[in-house]
C-alpha cells in the first residue's frame, strides 16, 4: 500500500524536540511557514524565557499550544528526589498554564533497582500530589 502525501495539516502538531537544533523562535517560525497548526514545547525550550510570552509568540502565528512536554519522572529511590520531582512537576504545570498549554505530557517510567510495583505506587502518589494544582489551573496531565 502506498502512503498518500500529507496535505491536511489542520490537526498536525510538531514537538520542538523534532528540530532539536532550533531555538523556540526559529521552530515557531518554520513550523508556521510549513502550515503546522500546533506545537508541543519541550521544557528546555522555555529555559530563560517567560512562558506567557512564549505562548503569545506561538499564538501570534496562528498556531495552537498543544502541550508542554515533559513532566513525570516521579519514581526515585530516595524520598528527597521524589519531593524534588513533585516540585518540578508543579513548575511544569504552572508554566503550561502561563503559556496556555492545556496539557502537560507525563513520562513516568521506572527506576533501575526498584520494583515496578513500587515505581507505579510512586507515580500514583506523584500524580495525586500534583493533580490539585493542575485542576486549579485548568491543565490536564497525560
Segments from the language model and where they lie:
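Acidic-and-aromatic substrate-binding clefts and catalytic sites of carbohydrate-active enzymes
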Residues: 17-23, 41-53, 73-80, 111-115
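General N-terminal targeting signals
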Residues: 29-31, 36-41, 53, 80-82, ...
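Acidic (Asp/Glu)-rich catalytic clusters
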Residues: 2-8, 28-33, 48-68, 90-100, ...
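Structural preference for beta-strand elements that scaffold enzyme active sites
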Residues: 9-13, 38-40, 62-69, 102-105, ...
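Conserved, mostly hydrophobic/aromatic
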Residues: 14, 31, 39, 58, ...
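Active-site acidic/histidine proton-transfer and metal-coordination neighborhood
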Residues: 4, 23, 75-142
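Boundary/entry segment of secreted carbohydrate-active catalytic domains
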Residues: 2-24
Amino acid at each position: 500500500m502506498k502512503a498518500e502525501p500529507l496535505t491536511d495539516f489542520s490537526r498536525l502538531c510538531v514537538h520542538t524536540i523534532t528540530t532539536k537544533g532550533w531555538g523556540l523562535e526559529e521552530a515557531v517560525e518554520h513550523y508556521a511557514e510549513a502550515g503546522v497548526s500546533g506545537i508541543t514545547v519541550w521544557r528546555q525550550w522555555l529555559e530563560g524565557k517567560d512562558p506567557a510570552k512564549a505562548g503569545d509568540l506561538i499564538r501570534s502565528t496562528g498556531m495552537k499550544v498543544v502541550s508542554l512536554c515533559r513532566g513525570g519522572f516521579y519514581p526515585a529511590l530516595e524520598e528527597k528526589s521524589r519531593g524534588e520531582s513533585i516540585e518540578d512537576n508543579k513548575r511544569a504545570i504552572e508554566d503550561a498554564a502561563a503559556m496556555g498549554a492545556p496539557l502537560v505530557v507525563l513520562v513516568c517510567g521506572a527506576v533501575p533497582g526498584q520494583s515496578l510495583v513500587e515505581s507505579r505506587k510512586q507515580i500514583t502518589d506523584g500524580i495525586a500530589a500534583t493533580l490539585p494544582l493542575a485542576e486549579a489551573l485548568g491543565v490536564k496531565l497525560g
